[in-house]
Swiss-Prot record:
Region forming the signal peptide: none
GO molecular function terms noted in the UniProt entry: metal ion binding; mRNA 5'-diphosphatase activity
UniProt keywords, alphabetically: Hydrolase, Metal-binding
Gene Ontology CC terms: cytoplasm
Motif Nudix box positions after renumbering to this chain: 38-59
Protein family membership: Belongs to the Nudix hydrolase family. RppH subfamily.
Domain Nudix hydrolase as annotated: residue spans: 6-149
Source organism of this protein record: Edwardsiella ictaluri (strain 93-146)
Name by which UniProt lists this protein: RNA pyrophosphohydrolase
Function: Accelerates the degradation of transcripts by removing pyrophosphate from the 5'-end of triphosphorylated RNA, leading to a more labile monophosphorylated state that can stimulate subsequent ribonuclease cleavage.
One GO-annotated biological process of the protein: mRNA catabolic process
Source species, domain of life: Bacteria
Length: 177
């Protein structure tokens, strides 16, 4: 499904833990890392697509996460010309994305990148909140910067809650200092 401007509707997913770290996933068979993302199918809402992609790419369901925020607007990036498939119609020149910030509610042991017959990722790790902005492929950096800026106040308040002795998510134990 490509819109009239040549952009494919898509969802992006930022999963954070109680410490404010985010899940950073390695693309299958590559040394390329990114947040989970995927297309919105015809007749599907952005939220429905997010839950489908969450299960397909990360192996988590609704009960495993809590939606903390979503972007107010669509965010767009253009594909580099070398990645555009000019021989397909309609031509997709990029993606327009709605992003969701999720908090992990289950044990990280539940994360399973191999639930799909065609896995998108073959590994993951927790990274500091701003790390992805500097590390993602260059044509996605502006969108990542905008997403992380929009979600930052939510994640920072989460970190403050933990620092002040807030309850940890199920499956997590606070480290004692």
């Amino acid at each position: 499904m490509i819109d009239d401007d040549g952009y494919r509707p898509n969802v992006g997913i930022v999963i954070c833990n109680r410490q404010g770290q985010v899940l950073w996933a390695r693309r299958y068979g590559q040394n390329s890392w990114q947040f989970p993302q995927g297309g919105i199918n015809a007749g599907e809402t952005a939220e429905q697509a997010m839950y489908r992609e969450l299960f397909e790419e990360v192996g988590l369901g609704r009960k495993d996460v809590k939606i903390l925020a979503s972007t107010r607007n669509w965010l767009r990036y253009k594909l580099p010309k070398r990645l555009v498939r000019w021989d397909t119609k309609p031509v997709c020149i990029g993606q327009k994305q709605r992003w969701f910030l999720l908090q992990l509610q289950c044990s990280e042991a539940e994360i399973n990148m191999q639930r799909s017959n065609t896995p998108e990722f073959d590994g993951w790790r927790w990274v500091s909140y701003w790390y992805p902005v500097r590390q993602v492929v260059s044509f996605k950096r502006d969108v990542y910067r905008r997403v992380m800026k929009e979600f930052s106040s939510v994640v920072m308040s989460l970190q403050e809650s933990v620092a002040q002795g807030g309850r940890s998510a199920p499956g997590y134990r606070r480290k004692r200092g």
